[in-house]
Amino acid sequence: GLSDTTSEAQRHAVAITDYIKGNIDTTTSVCHGPSGLAFQSVGESTSTLGEVKNRADLVIYWGGNPAESHPRHFGRYAVTPKGMFTPNGKKDRTVVLVDVRKTKSAGVADILIRPKPGKDFEILWALRALVKGNKLSANEGEWFWGVNIEEETGVSLETLTDLAERMKNCRFGVLFFGMGLTMTRGRHFNSGALLALATDLNKYTHFVAKPVRGHGNVTGADNVVAWQTGYPFGVNFSRGYPRFNPGEFTTVDTLSNGDADAALIIASDPGSNFPKKAIDHLKNIPVITLDTKS
């Protein structure tokens, strides 16, 4: 759990888990888990939302629909608010939406790019090549192995080239990515490609990448657990030192496999989204819940 509590409480939760040689996991394992894996392998060029509000003149939403999932995101941080270096609000920003379908978020987008489902990795890798000034093919519009880019991804080379140039020439750019990127084919490789693209762009301008996440302090939980153990979620202390293995030490798997004999749930609600097998095991073991509401 730990998603809706303070970083100080999260730190103590890690200490308790270490003391009893237990298992600690955050809600990331059922949400932006692939992003957590990508952070571990690629790193993250990031910033605060305050910096985005005050500086960003290019805002890209990739695989998310914040108009419905985070309805205040546009108004408070990324699209319409007036900032120190964006005094005219929306007029000072270019908003790009990359999604497989036209969602409600498309209403604020200046540019809508609709790739084929499951082709995010190919598009991101093509953008990395274009940003670095590489030609994708000797023949216009084709990959090196002769596959037409638009036929493969649903996005034309002209569109990708225009986006790459906008990214390189902005003053401050931000890539917000959602679970439409992380929970489709490619998983953490998709997140890693996007994070690597943001890092590449810092050779030309200031560019950051941020996951659009749920819950109050789930990012804080990942940061605290990573700070204390070296791993962001799904950490096991049974041998007296931290071990990380998603698929074994993540909560859904621990419960579904019947490995847990007691559970302490802190500031989260696994009952609302865990699979039936995990919930059934949770019913058969002692459970302590620390939450502000029942």
Regions found by a protein language model. Give the residues of each.
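Catalytic alpha/large subunits of respiratory electron-transfer oxidoreductases
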Residues: 1-294
